């Protein structure tokens, strides 16, 4: 089964061609990072306009790179949410138009489901499994019992982990996107500052990073007030040590309690080298499945893989009406 998939939930424009829920025939991705860098973050209206400008080119590139014809496509899948509503609508309208014009079945896919199924591209998901989903907008622990059978165990009570990284980067004047810069600098410094590790004892599966973020702000502010010299690398290392310790320990505890066969680490923050390293060092009795870096970030291949399994269980839409949502329910 050949699927054309579209992903425009935030600031990456991506169109992919996948086959049988496993093989990626093409995965065209166009990042808008340079467009948004002067503003210190994603500007929704600018993101939407950039998607519009590149959409036709990305459709053409994905089909050509895959070496297929439009008539070979069995299903069109598109990210339905969550995400920036303007960006989502660009992708949905493009996918719907393409599907209707060529009379190909259409399906909407949850963006977060796509992140989970990115692990299936280069590995083999073994159920039941535990997923740590970490991104700029989400931090969740999920019990995946089978294909599309997902139970939300815990989530963030305030800042998502990727959001916390970006805010700390902004405090330190590191620019946008901040997460990769903090990760890189953390490896050049030492975790010499004793920052809090918010484990939330009464809520073992939930997360909270706002207090840690505030502690970093206070630490830097106080050192500047005292004219005390400090290395940004050490601040980054201390922050990352606290974040990864919480993420890894909560994941380990949940896996032990639930008796899962595998752990999947997914989402944009799954590209973080500190997290990937600590996860493998601390959890040695279970297989840890983490997508390669190119499949951690937003791209359409993961949407195509998820769509294959969703189609097998639910089928396609009965018509070509698809509504986007910035806060679509995951479960």
UniProtKB/Swiss-Prot annotation:
Q: Does the keyword Transcription regulation apply?
A: no
Q: Name one Pfam family in it.
A: TsaD
Instruction: List the catalytic activities from the record.
Output: L-threonylcarbamoyladenylate + adenosine(37) in tRNA = N(6)-L-threonylcarbamoyladenosine(37) in tRNA + AMP + H(+)
Cofactor binding summary note: Binds 1 Fe(2+) ion per subunit.
Q: What InterPro entries does the record point to?
A: ATPase_NBD, Gcp-like_dom, KAE1/TsaD, TsaD
Its localization reads:
Cytoplasm
List UniProt keywords, sorted A-Z: Acyltransferase, Cytoplasm, Iron, Metal-binding, Transferase, tRNA processing
One GO biological process term: tRNA threonylcarbamoyladenosine modification
Q: Which residues are listed for substrate binding in this entry?
A: 133-137, 166, 179, 183, 272
Q: GO CC terms for this protein?
A: cytoplasm
Concerning Gene3D superfamilies, the annotation shows: 3.30.420.40
Q: What is its EC number?
A: 2.3.1.234
> Domain of life here?
Bacteria
- Where Fe cation binds, per the record, is at 111, 115, 298
Using the record for this protein, list the coiled-coil segments as residue ranges, or answer none. Answer: none
Q: Give the main localization category.
A: cytoplasm
* Annotated GO MF terms: iron ion binding; N(6)-L-threonylcarbamoyladenine synthase activity
Names of required cofactors = Fe(2+)
Instruction: State the family it belongs to.
Output: Belongs to the KAE1 / TsaD family.
Instruction: Tell me, in a sentence or two, what this protein's role is.
Output: Required for the formation of a threonylcarbamoyl group on adenosine at position 37 (t(6)A37) in tRNAs that read codons beginning with adenine. Is involved in the transfer of the threonylcarbamoyl moiety of threonylcarbamoyl-AMP (TC-AMP) to the N6 group of A37, together with TsaE and TsaB. TsaD likely plays a direct catalytic role in this reaction.
Record-given protein name: tRNA N6-adenosine threonylcarbamoyltransferase
Q: What's the source species for this entry?
A: Acholeplasma laidlawii (strain PG-8A)
Which lineage is the organism of this entry classified under, starting from the top rank? Bacteria, Bacillati, Mycoplasmatota, Mollicutes, Acholeplasmatales
UniProt lists the gene as tsaD
């Amino acid at each position: 089964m050949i699927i054309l998939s579209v992903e425009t939930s935030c600031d990456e424009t991506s169109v992919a061609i996948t086959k049988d829920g496993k093989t990626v025939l093409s995965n065209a991705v166009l990042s808008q990072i340079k467009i948004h860098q002067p503003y210190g973050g994603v500007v929704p209206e600018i993101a939407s306009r950039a998607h519009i400008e590149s959409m036709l080119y990305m459709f053409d590139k994905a089909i050509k790179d895959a070496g297929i014809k439009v008539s070979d496509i069995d299903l069109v899948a598109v990210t339905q949410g969550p995400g920036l509503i303007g960006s989502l609508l660009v992708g949905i309208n493009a996918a719907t138009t393409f599907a209707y014009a060529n009379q190909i079945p259409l399906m909407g896919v949850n963006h977060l489901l796509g992140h989970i199924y990115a692990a299936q591209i280069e590995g083999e998901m073994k159920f039941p499994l535990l997923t740590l989903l970490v991104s700029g907008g989400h931090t969740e622990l999920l019990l995946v019992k089978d294909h599309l059978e997902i139970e939300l165990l815990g989530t963030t009570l305030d800042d998502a982990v990727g959001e916390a990284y970006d805010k700390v980067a902004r405090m330190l004047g590191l620019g946008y996107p901040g997460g990769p810069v903090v990760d890189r600098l953390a490896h050049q410094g030492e975790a010499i500052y004793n920052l809090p590790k918010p484990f939330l004892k009464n809520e073992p599966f939930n997360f909270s990073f706002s207090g840690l973020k505030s502690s970093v702000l206070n630490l830097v502010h106080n050192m500047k007030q005292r004219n005390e010299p400090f290395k940004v690398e050490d601040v980054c290392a201390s922050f990352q040590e606290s974040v990864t310790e919480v993420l890894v320990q909560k994941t380990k505890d949940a896996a032990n309690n639930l008796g899962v066969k595998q752990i999947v680490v997914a989402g944009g923050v799954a590209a973080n080298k500190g997290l990937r390293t600590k996860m493998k060092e601390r959890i040695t009795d279970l297989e840890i499945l983490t997508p390669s870096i190119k499949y951690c970030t937003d791209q359409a291949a993961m949407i195509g893989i998820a769509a294959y399994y969703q189609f097998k269980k639910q089928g396609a839409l009965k018509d070509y009406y698809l509504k986007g949502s910035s806060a679509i329910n995951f479960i």
